[in-house]
Amino acid sequence: MANTLEQLKSYTTIVADTGDIEAIKRYQPEDATTNPSLILKAAQIPEYSYLIDNAIAWAQTQSTELEQQIDDASDKLAVNIGVEILKLVPGRISTEVDARLSFDKEKSIAKAHKLVRLYQEAGIDKSRILIKLASTWEGICAAKELEQEGINCNLTLLFSFAQARACAEAGVYLISPFVGRILDWYKKDTGKDYAPANDPGVVSVTEIYNYYKQHGYNTVVMGASFRNIGEIIELAGCDRLTIGPSLLEELANSQAQIQAKLLPATTTVAAETPLTEAQFRWDFNQDPMAVEKLAEGIRNFAIDQGKLEVMLKAKLSN
């Protein structure tokens, strides 16, 4: 009998949410996603020290200014890890733009161009890359321009329907609505526990998925940030699910029988008039959970980016 992970793969494209190359070898996902926190974690694995050494050496050929070298080494390391992962997955790698640029459209676009160039210099076509951006208004606007250039984007830190709708209207390739972090907020706010079917994160992703399919949007829905396999099983049938190694292992060790919970709409209705910036900001602001979790997510990614840069600075200063 097929284990739960194998069953899930028949309904949903499975993506590994990790920078750990060994974990990717083990679970054979279609795609992989990274973020500043996962890059920091991967950078501390001794087997990957050669990827850091390569990034440091490359950065030193690009500039004599230490701050620029740190920036270059950080970008190159993320790409080096991505290149290694792409040797193992048939699909795409998601690489994230510096979270500190989340409110700067032009700098986000420039950073995306740099990451794509570094991948291309390593022999990787842009068709195998997704540029990850936070789902701020500025991030969504940056993604809209990048998509028009043929650079596909993954809009992350997505906690609200307003963010999801704006992403679809911008023609974004893929969104990553966060399930577990929504659950965290509601558990803390209400003091309640939630069964997977009533999990606020599961409910949010289901609503977004149904809206996209009903309105004929092509934007891929990739549920992310899971706290337990119950959430994952409730979202079987979602376009994609990005799952960390510990939950992939739990799914692989489970024999639970599952079925598709999310199904594409049989009929579609016309899309609504796109949100204006003012409407987006108002609708988003009406959701305290989304406001708090987006801000927290950006801050935490920025903290881990800073820790990575401290590590790189020490190596560059030797």
From Swiss-Prot:
Coarse class of the protein's main subcellular location: cytoplasm
GO biological process: carbohydrate metabolic process; pentose-phosphate shunt
Top-level EC class as recorded in UniProt: transferase
EC number(s) on file: 2.2.1.2
Alphabetized UniProt keyword annotations: Cytoplasm, Pentose shunt, Schiff base, Transferase
Record: active site: 132
Pathway as given in its UniProt record: Carbohydrate degradation; pentose phosphate pathway; D-glyceraldehyde 3-phosphate and beta-D-fructose 6-phosphate from D-ribose 5-phosphate and D-xylulose 5-phosphate (non-oxidative stage): step 2/3
InterPro entries associated with the record: Aldolase_TIM, TAL/FSA, Transaldolase_1, Transaldolase_AS
Catalytic activity: D-sedoheptulose 7-phosphate + D-glyceraldehyde 3-phosphate = D-erythrose 4-phosphate + beta-D-fructose 6-phosphate
Subcellular location per the Swiss-Prot or TrEMBL entry: Cytoplasm
A GO molecular-function annotation: transaldolase activity
GO CC annotations, alphabetized: cytosol
Subunit-structure text: Homodimer.
Cited PANTHER family: TRANSALDOLASE
Family indicated by similarity: Belongs to the transaldolase family. Type 1 subfamily.
Known role: Transaldolase is important for the balance of metabolites in the pentose-phosphate pathway.
Protein's recorded name: Transaldolase
UniProt source species: Shewanella sp. (strain W3-18-1)
